[in-house]
């Protein structure tokens, strides 16, 4: 049908717990801006989603390392997910190599509209995006940040499917599970 569609905003690898790197030294006059750059960049993603009223915010891995992060970074992320919920924008988050679900503090609360997919297995959820029912297949990558096409073997193929994954795919020749794949990348610091 003509005119059907929905909008997905995709972001990955916020790494809120990692300071901006690659600089030999930071001039004192911009030190605060450099130190706050990861949070400012992430804030802009959430602001963009609200400004453009996207149908879905897809986050694919490595948002932050929950065991090494400050309370400020954890609180920031929780606040942003709540903002999305309050404005009717669901967040689908597929974990990456540094942010598996088992490492998150149990005290953190997640809005109902936040769907989290962990690494190593495929989860399924039907969502209505822009008035269209879409089956979302989600998974985080393995510990090395890879998503293996065989994880999707045996899953039924629907007309409107979307894969959201927190990692990279080892072989693009076998991507039969869906026509649309939204994937995170590997952390370049790991290479």
Protein language model regions, located:
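N-terminal active-site segment of His-dependent metallophosphoesterases
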Residues: 1-75
């Amino acid at each position: 049908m003509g005119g059907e569609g929905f909008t997905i905003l995709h972001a990955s690898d916020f790494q809120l717990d990692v300071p901006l790197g690659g600089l030999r030294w930071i001039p004192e006059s911009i030190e605060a801006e450099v130190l706050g750059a990861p949070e400012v960049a992430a804030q802009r993603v959430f602001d963009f989603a609200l400004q453009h009223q996207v149908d879905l915010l897809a986050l694919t891995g490595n948002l932050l390392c929950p065991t090494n992060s400050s309370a400020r970074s954890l609180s920031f992320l929780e606040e942003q997910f709540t903002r999305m919920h309050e404005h009717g924008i669901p967040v689908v988050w597929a974990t990456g190599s540094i942010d598996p679900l088992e490492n998150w503090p149990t005290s953190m609360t997640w809005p109902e509209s936040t769907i989290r997919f962990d690494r190593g297995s495929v989860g399924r959820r039907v969502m209505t995006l822009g008035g269209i029912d879409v089956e979302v297949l989600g998974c985080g990558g393995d510990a090395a940040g890879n998503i293996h096409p065989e994880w999707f073997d045996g899953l039924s193929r629907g007309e409107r499917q979307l894969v959201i994954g927190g990692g990279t795919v080892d072989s693009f020749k076998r991507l039969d599970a869906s026509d649309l794949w939204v994937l995170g990348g590997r952390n370049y610091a790991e290479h």
